[in-house]
UniProtKB/Swiss-Prot annotation:
Described purpose of this protein according to its UniProt entry: Produces ATP from ADP in the presence of a proton gradient across the membrane. The alpha chain is a regulatory subunit.
Keywords from the UniProt entry: ATP synthesis, ATP-binding, Cell inner membrane, Cell membrane, CF(1), Hydrogen ion transport, Ion transport, Membrane, Nucleotide-binding, Translocase, Transport
Record's protein name: ATP synthase subunit alpha 2
Pfam short name (any one): ATP-synt_ab
Principal cellular location given in the protein's record: membrane
Lineage start: Bacteria, Pseudomonadati, Pseudomonadota, Alphaproteobacteria, Rhodobacterales
Subunit structure: F-type ATPases have 2 components, CF(1) - the catalytic core - and CF(0) - the membrane proton channel. CF(1) has five subunits: alpha(3), beta(3), gamma(1), delta(1), epsilon(1). CF(0) has four main subunits: a(1), b(1), b'(1) and c(9-12).
Topology of this chain in the membrane: Peripheral membrane protein
Length: 512
């Protein structure tokens, strides 16, 4: 078979005609050294601080240190495949993440890549991970309640939409349990809201430096209860590199801000910020930034303040949305005066202290009501809750003070004895099993029973049984009363008080 010269020339002409002239221009640099998740790169002269750069094999990094002769880049992934002399490209974009409704029900990493095996995330909207917090003018003071479903929190340490409330305690004191119960509690409210977005609350949970098994367990619980439908889980686990653990809270806040900025309401839980500070310290020391107190860098306060300031209640002109934050901090041996705990306490609008001592006494949630405080206070409570919850905090404070003295004296006068009896029953009443949040109306009725003397004749050991029976009685025979408290939100006096008293008297007659 002969070679067809005409055919070959035709093919060559065709190839030459269609030859693409467009050349891709990319600013590149070369890796000088790499190790411990940090790369030193030479040649990226115009790179911006916080810009995403790309290594061979699609591995991404972020430029953090801009020095005279090189750029310090933190690597979002394994640095094993990166070697000296590799080419690094600028992407010309600051680190951003996907946002939008498509993320609801998903588990993603700190860059928004899915981890749950449910396919890609169908959204075109993206947002920069580290954006500026809203200014003073767009904000409005916090006034709507954000119900946690926990009696001790909703009654004594109320949280409002747009507030930042710190959950602080040693390891194994139930910090995550409080946060998880808050997410589960929103299911009833979200289901009842229907299409009314102003009543719904979307939840974002950020796991920083936790075990993968712990995160998997949490996701399983959310799926079982159906709470995953209105939740996003962002996971940067203990096995992820430090830069991912540093970035995850910022990325998750951008996902939550999507709801805030569209006139909706969101809740974000950072579990926990101590581990984020540790990973930031690791990165800073490896980048040779000067260390400060406890070897943390000088800007570790700013690390947390710029993150938590993004949670806000926006005013009418800006869509009325809100973002509530529940940051979690783990203390060592109950030391709340360490560097990171004091920093975050000063940034937030209050804190819930959880104590090991109370936890082992069986008081769970182990909230120390004396040290816990909400700086928004009763402006974030419903009228009904406000009118019954006032006396509880005072009575428990008096009880704690008296209980300390009562250990020394045996002959106590009747008033002191009454105070101790009431306090013991209220303490018992504040206990609550995990995964069983209560509605606002149920908490109002239970606390009313506690403060108005309905428990005074009941042995302390039977308080839990009384409460269980009372809730079953209210849900079965007095659903109308619970609906009335929920919808009308009356002050508990006059007619409303009579209705609750009638229901409690009816139950008292059957309880034995």
């Amino acid at each position: 078979m002969g070679i067809q010269a005409a055919e070959i020339s035709a093919i060559l002409k065709e190839q030459i005609k269609n030859f693409g002239q467009e050349a891709e221009v990319a600013e590149v640099g070369r890796v000088l050294s790499v190790g411990d998740g940090i790369a030193r790169v030479h040649g990226l002269d115009n790179v911006q601080a916080g810009e995403m750069v790309e290594f061979p094999g699609g591995i991404r990094g972020m430029a953090l240190n801009l020095e005279i002769d090189n750029v310090g880049v933190v690597i979002f992934g394994s640095d094993r495949d990166i070697k000296e002399g590799d080419i690094v490209k600028r992407t010309k974009s600051i680190v951003d993440v996907p946002v939008g409704d498509a993320l609801l029900g998903r588990v993603v990493d700190g860059l928004g890549n899915p981890l749950d095996g449910k396919g890609p995330i169908e959204t075109t909207e993206r947002s920069i991970a580290d954006v500026k917090a809203p200014g003073i003018i767009p904000r409005k003071s916090v006034h709507e309640p954000m119900a946690t479903g926990l009696k001790s929190v909703d009654a004594m340490i109320p949280i409002g939409r747009g507030q930042r409330e710190l959950i602080i305690g040693d390891r194994q004191t139930g910090k995550t349990a409080v946060a998880l119960d808050t997410i589960l509690n929103q299911k009833a409210y979200n289901d009842a809201a229907g299409d009314d977005e102003s009543k719904k609350l979307y939840c974002v949970y950020v796991a920083v430096g936790q075990k993968r098994s712990t995160v998997a367990q949490l996701v399983k619980k959310l799926e079982e209860t159906g709470a995953i439908e209105y939740s996003i889980v962002v996971a940067a686990t203990a096995s992820d590199p430090a830069p991912m653990q540093f970035l995850a809270p910022y990325a998750a806040t951008s996902m939550a801000e999507f709801f805030r900025d569209n006139g909706r309401h969101a809740l974000i839980i950072y579990d926990d910020l101590s581990k984020q500070a540790v990973s930031y310290r690791q990165m800073s020391l490896l980048l040779r930034r000067p260390p400060g107190r406890e070897a943390y860098p000088g800007d570790v306060f700013y690390l947390h303040s710029r993150l938590l300031e993004r949670s806000a209640k926006l005013g009418d002109d800006h869509g009325n949305g809100s973002l509530t934050a529940l940051p979690i901090i783990e203390t060592q041996g109950g030391d709340v005066s360490a560097f990171i705990p004091t920093n975050v306490i000063s940034i937030t609008d209050g804190q819930i202290f959880l104590e090991t001592e109370l936890f082992y006494q069986g008081i769970r949630p182990a909230v120390n009501t004396g040290l816990s405080v909400s700086r928004v206070g009763s402006s974030a409570q419903t009228n009904a809750m406000k009118s019954v919850a006032g006396p509880v905090k005072l009575e428990l404070a008096q009880y704690r003070e008296m209980a300390a003295f009562a250990q020394f004296g045996s002959d106590l006068d009747a008033a002191t004895q009454q105070l101790l009896n009431r306090g013991a029953r209220l303490t018992e009443l504040m206990k609550q099993p995990q995964y069983s949040p209560l509605t606002n109306a149920e908490i109002v009725c239970v606390i009313f029973a506690g403060t108005k003397g309905y428990l005074d004749k009941i042995p302390v050991g039977d308080v839990g049984r009384y409460e269980k029976g009372l809730l079953a009685h209210l849900r079965g025979k007095h659903k109308g009363l619970l609906d009335y408290i929920t919808k009308e939100d009356p002050k508990i006096k006059g007619e409303a008080e009579d209705k609750i008293r009638a229901a409690l008297d009816e139950f008292a007659a059957t309880f034995a």
